[in-house]
């Protein structure tokens, strides 16, 4: 299987999740460790995670070094529209996802693919003029293709930070779907597939007289709705529901 290297940012936590992610670097060194290892490794390709804040700081220099070395590496650049690790500030210089894509193309990256969340509002026609675009449900297929592509490739994953979504929705600055997901505890069997599919911290254990089930913490739910991809009939979708204020 494939492996990924970590870097500086929230995604560093993937190291602790037993998901074949290792090797954090200093800021701006993302992927450069692979440039030295590649000639002596039996592995042909790696992925490198890179946050948009680090990219804006010095990450592009590492990508340019990878292009110059002709390494087989795919940079997975998360554009979450915030310097999330330090409080959700805006990027210096108002960096945008389309600017990142344009810079990657100019730097000589062989193939750039934009991955997007279909629930977010942005000009998809504009992005399709810059690179190939695919919904996030196609991520695994795109990763498999890029892993077999020689040279430097990149995925720009465009999805706003979940914590920032909640903050902006409270101020009316971000689309707020009029829908909430609940779990019917009488149907739920506690298999946990919803958590496997969504990796969402809002799915909490619910102790019942029939054993442990699952419930959704509505106070932290960011309305991602990926939990409903779980193989389970217990989900209830409610339109117009609001959290009761104390």
Question: Where do the protein language model's features map onto the residues?
Answer:
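Iron-sulfur-cluster electron-transfer modules
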Residues: 1-3, 9-22, 26-30, 218, ...
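Thiamine diphosphate
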Residues: 3-85, 92-98, 140-141
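Gly-rich Lys/Arg/Thr-decorated short loops/hinges at beta-loop-alpha junctions or inter-strand turns
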Residues: 11-20, 43-44, 80-88, 120-127, ...
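N-terminal export/assembly segments and adjacent metallocofactor-ligating motifs
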Residues: 34-39, 45-46, 72, 82, ...
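Glycine-rich ThDP/TPP pyrophosphate-binding loop and its adjacent helix/strand module
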Residues: 82-173, 177
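Iron-sulfur cluster-binding cysteine motifs and their immediate structural context
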Residues: 159-160, 165-171, 189-244
């Amino acid at each position: 299987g494939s492996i990924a290297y970590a870097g500086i940012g929230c995604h560093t936590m993937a190291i602790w999740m037993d998901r074949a992610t290792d090797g954090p670097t200093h800021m701006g060194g993302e992927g450069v460790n692979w440039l030295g290892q590649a000639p002596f490794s039996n592995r042909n390709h790696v992925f490198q995670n890179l946050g948009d804040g680090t990219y804006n700081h010095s990450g592009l220099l590492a990508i340019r070094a990878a292009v110059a070395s002709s390494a087989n590496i795919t940079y997975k650049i998360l554009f979450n529209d915030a310097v999330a690790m330090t409080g959700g500030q805006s990027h210096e210089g108002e960096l945008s996802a389309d600017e990142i894509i344009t810079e990657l193309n100019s730097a000589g990256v062989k193939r750039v693919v934009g991955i997007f969340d279909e629930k977010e509002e942005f000009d998809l026609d504009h992005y399709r003029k810059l690179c190939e675009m695919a919904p996030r449900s196609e991520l695994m297929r795109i990763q498999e293709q890029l892993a077999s592509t020689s040279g430097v490739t990149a995925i720009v994953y465009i999805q706003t930070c979940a914590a920032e979504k909640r903050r902006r929705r409270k101020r009316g600055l971000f689309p707020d779907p009029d829908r909430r997901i609940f779990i019917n505890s009488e149907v739920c069997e506690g298999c946990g597939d919803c958590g496997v599919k969504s990796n969402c911290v809002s799915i909490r254990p619910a102790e019942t007289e029939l054993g442990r089930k699952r419930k959704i913490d509505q106070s932290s739910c960011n309305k991602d709705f990926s939990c409903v991809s779980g193989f389970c009939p217990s989900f209830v979708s409610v339109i117009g529901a609001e959290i009761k204020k104390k």
